[in-house]
Amino acid sequence: MQRIVVIGGGAAGFFGAITCAQYNPEATVLLLEKSGKLLSKVRVSGGGRCNVTHHCFVPSVLSQHYPRGGKQLKEAFRTFGAQETIDWFAQRGVQLKAEADGRMFPVTDNSETIVNCLLQEAKRVGVQIRTGAGVDRITAVSYTL
């Protein structure tokens, strides 16, 4: 059986673990978080409302709203951009709204809406979660396909 380990219990770690579990249902997906708190930055982002994405559907323009790593994000946004993010949350019952400046938040204006969605989806697809599980090294192992 294939085992996949995702390091980090933030938004990217959760989304990565969920996606791995969806596309590899036979695999065991384990998410490791060093601290005891999952999704802590999600809880405080956007003043506790959680700025999920930006209301912009052109990858090269969307990447400009991310000053750190915008250049590297262009290709990622071509694959999974704002519309895909909106759709992903909508499919899980979370509606987003755009503010005048383009920032998008859950209609509840509460980051717990996003936190709960990610936690519930991880549980639904079978992601195993361990907190207090820091990683201090990764060792390569041999394998054959």
Language-model regions: role of each:
Residues 73-81, 101-120:
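Short beta-strand to alpha-helix junction loop
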Residues 49-98:
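Glycine-rich active-site loop/strand segments that organize a redox cofactor
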Residues 117, 121, 125-131:
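Active-site-proximal cofactor/substrate-binding loop regions of enzyme domains
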Residues 12-16, 38-41:
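Short N-terminal binding/cap micro-motifs at the start of the first secondary-structure element
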Residues 131-141:
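A conserved short coil-to-beta-strand element within the FAD-binding core of flavoproteins
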Residues 1-12:
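Beta1/beta-strand and adjacent pyrophosphate-binding region of the FAD-binding site
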Residues 21-46:
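Glycine-rich FAD pyrophosphate-binding loop
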Residues 143-145:
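Conserved small/polar residues in nucleotide/adenosyl-binding loops
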